Every structure is written in C-alpha cells, then in structure tokens.
C-alpha cells in the first residue's frame, strides 16, 4: 500500500488496555516491519492511555526528522470506487466487478520502464512522473509480464491501459 512511503510511529502506554496493544499497534508494527515499511512502536511501561505528557518531545523530534516522498517509484493502490482510484501517477478508472476493490501495483524501473500488475480493473491510467521518467523518450510498460506499451507519451502525458476480453493494451 501507499503506507510504504509514510513513516509511522506508534506510542502506547503499557498500562493502557492490554488487549488493544495486542490487536492494534503490536501486530501493525510487526506487519510493517515484515513488509519493509518504516513503522516503529514505543511502549511506555508506566503510562496509561494518555501518553502526551511523557511522549511529546520524543514524538516531535521524530516527526521533524521525517521527509515526504514526493515522487514514489512504486505505488500499490486499492479503490472500491473510481473517484477514489488516484494515487500519485496511477489512476484506476474502471472497476470490473463492483463491490470488490480494484488494485494496481506499479513500479518504475531503470531503462524508462514501468511494471504493472492489476486486479479487478479494466482501465488504468499512468501519468509518468517527469522526475522519475524521461517522457520525451520511449516508455515501456509491462502489465502482468507482457509489454502493452512501448512509445513516447502523447500530448496528454499519460498512458491509458485498457483490457478487452482477456487482453490488455496501452495507448
């Protein structure tokens, strides 16, 4: 998910409801570490639910060290509705099976190349980020292991990927 580029710092009081810690911040931060994301947990043994009096300085110091990733090379995005389908340079425009989320996992690789995997969608738009790709040169797009686009972007500066029957194509 896009949490890949969003650092998370959980603070939990050791005297707070222990069940919450076991179903909330503990498994969340474990999963973030498993995925290689930047997530950490600070358990304050003597604190209850309200940790602000003992955690503010450390939390602010941590927050001031974080940097926003303005141009992510990889985006994994899910949406239940097309109006919620845009994330950075990827947009889900059509959902094949309503009621189920559509998903796009797209990453920019060396050589002006984008590798994409899609689920439950029939139309995806890529808007190549000029900080990551040279839009004046050919851009290759591989979708589910097959080249579906290998050209320069048109005047719209976007690549539209559409699936008809079982075949994806790009323009």
Feature-to-residue mapping (PLM):
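Alpha/beta-hydrolase-fold serine-hydrolase catalytic core, especially in secreted/extracellular enzymes
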Residues: 30-171
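A structural signal for well-ordered alpha-helical segments within the folded catalytic domains
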Residues: 23-26, 57
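Extracellular/periplasmic catalytic domains that process cell-envelope and extracellular macromolecules
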Residues: 1-4, 34-35
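Beta-sheet entry/capping signal
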Residues: 7-8, 40
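Alpha-helical scaffolding within the catalytic cores
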Residues: 1, 26-27
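Short beta-strand/loop motif that positions the catalytic acidic residue
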Residues: 3, 9-13
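Acidic catalytic loop of the alpha/beta-hydrolase fold
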Residues: 14-23, 49-50
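Sequence-level detector for tyrosine residue identity
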Residues: 10, 17-20, 37, 80
């Amino acid at each position: 998910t896009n949490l890949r580029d969003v650092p998370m710092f959980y603070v939990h009081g050791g005297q707070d409801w222990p069940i919450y810690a076991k179903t909330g911040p503990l498994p969340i931060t474990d999963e973030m570490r498993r995925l290689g994301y930047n997530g950490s947990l600070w358990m304050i043994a003597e604190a209850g639910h309200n940790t602000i009096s003992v955690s503010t300085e450390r939390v602010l110091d941590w927050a001031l060290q974080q940097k926003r990733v303005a141009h992510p090379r990889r985006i994994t995005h899910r949406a239940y509705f097309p109006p919620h389908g845009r994330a950075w340079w990827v947009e889900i425009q059509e959902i094949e099976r309503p009621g189920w989320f559509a998903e796009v996992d797209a990453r920019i690789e060396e050589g002006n190349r984008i590798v994409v995997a899609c689920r439950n969608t029939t139309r995806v738009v890529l808007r190549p980020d000029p900080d990551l790709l040279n839009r004046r040169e050919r851009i290759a797009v591989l979708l589910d292991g097959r080249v579906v686009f290998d050209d320069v972007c048109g005047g719209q500066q976007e690549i539209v990927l559409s699936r008809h029957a079982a075949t994806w194509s790009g323009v």
